């Protein structure tokens, strides 16, 4: 299955998602925002999430596949003051996604569309059997 990839996600967030509860995550890294910009929420919309950095993402890396429940991209204006006379105004883009755990996954192939393009992956859902 081919889907967008979110990289550099905290292992604690991935652990919480594996517990089965939907979570809302705020993304501020540009490459992750670009990766989810074209993702439409729905039961057939999946994203691969991993704690591996984008530069190190290769076939064989492990992560999780999640279902996208909601997305929003917004711009925040920030003003910083220094010494009472100087101030700097900046804008910061961020994205919020609500996701729910689907399955553990392994990367089969990585598709990179340049520095400012989205990163997507071909993933295989992992099967786990327990002897009883």
Residue ranges and their predicted role:
Residues 1, 74-75:
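Structural alpha-beta junctions
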Residues 1-3, 57-64:
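Aromatic-rich, lipid-facing transmembrane alpha helices and their immediate juxtamembrane interface loops
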Residues 1-42, 132:
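Compositionally biased, charged N-terminal/linker segments
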Residues 11, 53-55, 73-74:
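Short, solvent-exposed loop/turn segments at secondary-structure junctions
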Residues 16-17, 36-38, 57-60, 80-81:
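Short histidine-centered beta-strand/loop micro-motifs
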Residues 35-57:
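Short coil-to-beta transition motif at edge beta-strands of beta-rich domains
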Residues 60-65, 77-132:
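Contiguous surface segments at macromolecular interaction interfaces
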Residues 67-72:
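Conserved hydrophobic positions within beta-strands
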């Amino acid at each position: 299955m081919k889907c967008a990839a979110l990289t550099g996600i905290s292992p604690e967030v991935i652990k919480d998602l594996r517990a089965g509860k939907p979570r809302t995550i705020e993304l501020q890294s540009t490459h992750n925002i670009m990766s989810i910009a074209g993702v439409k929420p729905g039961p057939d919309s999946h994203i691969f999430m991993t704690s591996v950095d984008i530069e190190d993402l290769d076939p064989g890396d492990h992560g999780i596949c999640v279902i996208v429940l909601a997305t929003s991209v917004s711009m925040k204006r920030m003003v910083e003051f220094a010494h009472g006379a100087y101030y700097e105004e900046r804008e910061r883009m961020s994205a919020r996604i609500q996701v729910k755990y689907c399955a553990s996954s392994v990367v089969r192939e990585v598709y990179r569309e340049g520095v400012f393009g989205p990163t997507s992956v071909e993933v295989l859902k992992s099967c786990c059997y327990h002897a009883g």
